[in-house]
């Protein structure tokens, strides 16, 4: 997965990225890399405004995912409740992170009335840490899942009270979720998307927000991220991201 090198500490355009271990192709760690790179450039070039833009981009691509989930559920006559939210998720752990032993490890500590889930191992956290970017990871994760849920159904109350980047686990709480220990939380396979798709969704959401806010300088941020991506993952994977330029991520495509 790109060239091995020194761990990044903030932005280092001419450097390399140290992965947890070598794996080729799109996966959770590549997805985290995209977010980390946008955080690097946005905060270095624009300071606090850049951080706010990063949060806005995170919320955009997360809400887009949630809306696609909701559209599939509505098509199938499902209620937009938290059980359906679980079943219509768009990803499952890749073989790459399973081989590395860093696939998500979670534990439900409360089923009701509030559903509480804790995450103890996460490949996104591992990637942010390997890049020396735990603050970027914390900002990303405190806004991601609650935004996916908001895109799915804004009337569900989803809270992220701590993240693995600063604590021993992430804590996710959904108020009055209506969940039970025997609730089916398995993913419906027809809604799963590849990590190539998810990485492209992330890249183009951040790119759209960066350009809208910072105009030509925002376009330069996207170009810098893409250049780093091609350096670390190769032209073929960078070209794969580019082919999604005109995709409407707000709607289901099948």
Indicate residue ranges for each PLM-predicted region.
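N-terminal accessory segment detector
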Residues: 1-114, 123-143, 150, 156-169, ...
């Amino acid at each position: 997965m790109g060239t091995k090198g020194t761990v990044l500490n903030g932005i280092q355009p001419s450097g390399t990225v140290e992965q947890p271990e070598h794996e080729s192709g799109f996966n959770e760690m590549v997805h985290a890399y995209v977010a980390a790179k946008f955080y690097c450039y946005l905060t270095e070039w624009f300071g606090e405004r850049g951080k706010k833009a990063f949060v806005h981009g995170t919320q955009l691509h997360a809400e887009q995912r949630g809306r696609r989930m909701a559209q599939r559920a509505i098509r199938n006559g499902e209620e937009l409740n938290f059980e359906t939210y679980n079943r219509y998720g768009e990803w499952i752990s890749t073989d790459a992170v399973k081989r590395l032993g860093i696939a998500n490890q979670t534990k439900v500590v409360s089923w009701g009335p509030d559903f509480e889930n804790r995450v103890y191992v996460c490949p996104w956290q591992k990637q942010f840490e390997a890049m020396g970017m735990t603050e970027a990871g914390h900002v990303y994760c405190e806004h991601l899942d609650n935004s996916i849920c908001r895109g799915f159904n804004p009337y569900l109350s989803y809270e992220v009270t701590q993240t693995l980047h600063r604590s021993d686990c992430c804590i996710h709480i959904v108020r009055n979720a209506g969940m039970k220990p025997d609730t089916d939380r398995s993913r419906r396979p027809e809604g799963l998307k590849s990590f190539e798709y998810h990485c492209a969704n992330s890249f183009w959401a951040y790119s759209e927000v960066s350009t809208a806010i910072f105009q030509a300088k925002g376009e330069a941020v996207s170009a810098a991220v893409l250049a780093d991506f091609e350096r670390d993952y190769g032209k073929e994977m960078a070209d794969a991201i580019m082919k999604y330029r005109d995709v409407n991520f707000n709607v289901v495509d099948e």
